[in-house]
């Protein structure tokens, strides 16, 4: 199931809802994708270091249980929270992250951003800039509890990027961030979110089907 949350969504409230959903689910619970835009907020992951918060100003900071360092969420950015049963899909965490990245790349290509790419050793999706620099356009951060994943990814659509200057994005000093608008792609948060959710649902559904076929002894 794919659903949009009320916007702007309060980060702490959505995080609590994800934890509640995950704690209550069982083997038969359907997977869900939650889409939203957040009010401005910095989030610091489990291994996040305070020194990467350079100048948060008046933007609130939330320490959460996802992986990764610090990032920023705000209007003009779509969040896709993927509440997936990884055991049902037969996915390890690394395979799951790869699936999220591949689905994001497919979405960007569908939107016409063919040059988007991954960066070895640095999760997320990047766009080459003049001079060869890679600027980050999508950030990933996940949590897996008892085989159930939550949190997900953030894709920059058309937003005020200046709050990223108040942090070392994802723990990398001087890492540049970019959005679709700056890359010449004009689209809405709603359209980008729907395309992204469709790619994520398709990729995860294929993994679930392949896992079921393997357990049944049927060639995939």
From Swiss-Prot:
Pathway: Protein modification; protein lipoylation via endogenous pathway; protein N(6)-(lipoyl)lysine from octanoyl-[acyl-carrier-protein]: step 1/2. GO terms for biological process: protein modification process. Residues 27-208 form the BPL/LPL catalytic domain. Its main location: cytoplasm. The record marks 136 as: Lowers pKa of active site Cys. Keywords: Acyltransferase, Cytoplasm, Transferase. It is an enzyme of class 2 (transferase). The keyword Transferase applies. GO terms for cellular component: cytoplasm. It catalyses: octanoyl-[ACP] + L-lysyl-[protein] = N(6)-octanoyl-L-lysyl-[protein] + holo-[ACP] + H(+). Its EC number is 2.3.1.181. It is found in: Cytoplasm. The active site is at residue 170. The keyword Acyltransferase applies. Belongs to the LipB family. Catalyzes the transfer of endogenously produced octanoic acid from octanoyl-acyl-carrier-protein onto the lipoyl domains of lipoate-dependent enzymes. Lipoyl-ACP can also act as a substrate although octanoyl-ACP is likely to be the physiological substrate. In the reaction, the free carboxyl group of octanoic acid is attached via an amide linkage to the epsilon-amino group of a specific lysine residue of lipoyl domains of lipoate-dependent enzymes. NCBIfam families: lipB, PRK14342.1. This is Octanoyltransferase. It comes from Bordetella pertussis (strain Tohama I / ATCC BAA-589 / NCTC 13251). The lineage of its organism: Bacteria, Pseudomonadati, Pseudomonadota, Betaproteobacteria, Burkholderiales. The gene is lipB.
